[in-house]
Amino acid sequence: MPRLTARRLHVLGKLALGCGALLTVTAPAKLPAATGLGRPSPASAASGVSEKGISAAECTANHRAGTIVFATSYSYAPAASIADVVVAARRGYFKDMCLDVSLQPGFSTDNVALVSADRVQISSLGSDSEVLAARAEGANLEGVLTYGHTAISELITPGDAKITNLKQLDGTTVGIKGALPYEVSAMLTKAGVDIASLKLVQVGYNPVIIDQGRIMALPVYKSNEIRELNVLGYRYKVWDPTSYGVAASFASLVANRGFAQAHPTAVADFLRADIAGFWWAYRHQDQAVAYCEQLVPPQLGITRPVGRFRWRVESGLVIRYTPTKEPIGAIDLSLVKVEYAQDVRLHLVAAGVNIHTAFNLTFISEIYRGTTLVWPKNFAS
């Protein structure tokens, strides 16, 4: 898969990701007891879960799914589509849904082959564009949830470089980690930058390189490097893809198509527990970050302050940019269509993908009543 391989982190990054811990959550042998604190939920849903609990039939069906392996998209960093899953595991939400779940650290594009081969049943990818790219290359997976409906990456230039137009970057050196993010590539192209003229060089994870005269631009995460530069007092200029009308997304969950077809209630209830984990993590940010901190390898440098900033920014973007009258995690095909058309036009993703089969909206529709998650009121929440 040439496009995805080009987007992978360099070897040191992948080694660091592989050092994370495995976390296994085993479902109870019997129907979970309706104990613990909870909040009222809608009376019913299009499955065997209601405010009263989970039906014996659905619990049995979920047991039949066996162990669900979930691979994270960036070790156990407290990011959207990771922190929520970690919380769901630690808080017992998967157990409540009669699911056996095993978490393993990973990197988003490396997970495509694992999910496609059913070695991993559910995983997190970086964006809907990554889902589309995977499908364009024949991956046997489908998008089942999208948390972020905006750009998570942006571009920064040195504060003293006097760059007032992105076109000024033509022929300059740009630092990257793997490859240019989809939304940054789209922004540069929209601004008239000759991408082929850029000298793309692999750089490390320290963003202060933007102030060392070696590069003229650096893609960063809104939820990560910006904090470090601010703390250290560095000056920089931000170029946000959203200001250029770029369609973007982040934190997408995918499932193996065969597994999803064979075990639809297990996939739906995994997402149900995950979204319950998202809301708990949003309300208890310090504890959610602490859960992740216990699993993330120290060499990634994700300290408690760094983790808090990442989760606060990403969870805030998820809520702020969720389309009106749609629930958290919903896949909006109208937005996917725009993002895909943009990717094809800019030669970022191959044409020919059917977005209606690349994404499965059924699971999200089954776990919500309107915009309220169906969750048993006597289960922990």
Which residues make up each language-model segment?
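N-terminal export and membrane-targeting signals
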Residues: 1-19
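Bacterial lipoprotein signal-peptidase II cleavage site
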Residues: 29-37
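Second-shell loop/turn segments in exported
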Residues: 75, 171-174, 213-216, 258-260, ...
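Periplasmic-binding protein-like
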Residues: 147-157, 231-260, 267, 271
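Secondary-structure end/capping motifs
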Residues: 263-349
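Conserved C-terminal helix/tail region of periplasmic/extracytoplasmic solute-binding proteins
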Residues: 336-381
